[in-house]
Every structure is written in C-alpha cells, then in structure tokens.
Amino acid sequence: MPVTELAAFTTIAHNAVTPELLAACVQAVEVQDEWCAANLTSTPLGHEARGAALFQQVEDPAVILMTAHWASVAEHGLWIASEENERVYPAVQEHIDNDNIRFFHVDGIEAFTIVEDDEGAVPVLRSPVVGIALFSVVKDRKDEFESVYAGVKNIKDEFAKPYVHRGGWRIEEVEGREDVEEYVVIGGWESVKAAKEFSKSKDFDKYSDAIASVTLSVEVEHYKRLF
C-alpha cells in the first residue's frame, strides 16, 4: 500500500520563505528525484509524478510543507538514510526550527496527484489551494469513525467538486497522545474562501454533527504551492 509523506517545518525568517530556503528545498527534491530514478525502479519519474512538492501554510506563513508518495514507510527510510539526503538536508536545516518539525505518513493513499482518472477532476497539485483536515479519534472508536465518515463523506466530496479529496490514517503515533488516532483528509479548493463556504452549505450540519459524534477535535489547514 502506498503512503503519503507530510513533513511540516517552521522557518526562522519571521514568517517568510526566503529565496535561500526555497532553493535548498528545491535542490533536495531534485536530488531525491535522481536518487529515486536510480534506486527505485517502480517509482514514476519526475517530482510531480511522485507527489513531491513544497507548500506554504496560509494560516501561518512560517510553516512550510514538503510532500511525496512512497511505496512504504520503509522505502522512504532508504532515502532518509542515503548519502544523498545527508548531503542536501543540512542546507534545509539552516533555515528552519529543527525543534519544531511535524513529520508523518498517511496510509493507503497517494494524495498529491498530478493527474486524475475522472474526467474534469482537478488534481491536488493543480489546485490553487490545498486543504488538510486532521480528525482526532479515540483509538477504541476507530472503526466507528470509519463507518460514520463513510456515511457523510459524499457531502463534502460533492461540494468540493471538481476538486478531489482523499483520506487515510496517520501511521506514526500522535506525539503525547497514545490513545488517539488521526485521520487525515487532503484535497484541493479554488480558494480558502471557497473552502470556508462549505460550512454554509445546506448539508453541512448533517456532515458536521456526524463527524462531531465520533471525533475529539478537527483541525483544518490550508496551503498554497511554492514548487
């Protein structure tokens, strides 16, 4: 099963993504591309085909997000341990708060698509804004959440069209919350304003009430692509 990598960093440049940081991140992605082409024969060529991209958060511009698709967490681990990564990552570290990194994988999805099978659907990497919703769920209610979410998922999907949204469970444990699982939904929007219009739609209360009945909290972030 594929996994989607989400790595969120906080810049040390007062809410700015400096040219130096952007250049370091782009170089890291390009070197990663070369490494994948040489070492992972089943991986598609090109960073967009791999879901590898860089985003800046709208709510907090100091937060940048790097993404990629991998066949497994173990496959990603091979890149992390590589000489190539050890060579390029320090240039990124110079520009971020290394004590404030959020890093995890989402199970079973390739969220940052560049093409979609459905005619007219807009891939996430072609979306003006990307939304990430984090649903905190008590572990014992994981199956219940899946059942409830499946019953109302179409409400958001229909409202969001032609943009595509996909979700999966966070693989790594939520730090300091051993009794909590996190379900992550990633998808595109025309704008942040358009995303917020969902809360005013006619079926939102049905969706919201159902989600509230099986979650501890819901956090929503929005991002714009840098690379």
Stretch-by-stretch model annotation:
Residues 1-227:
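Short S/T/G/P-rich N-terminal loop/turn motif that feeds into the first structured element of a domain
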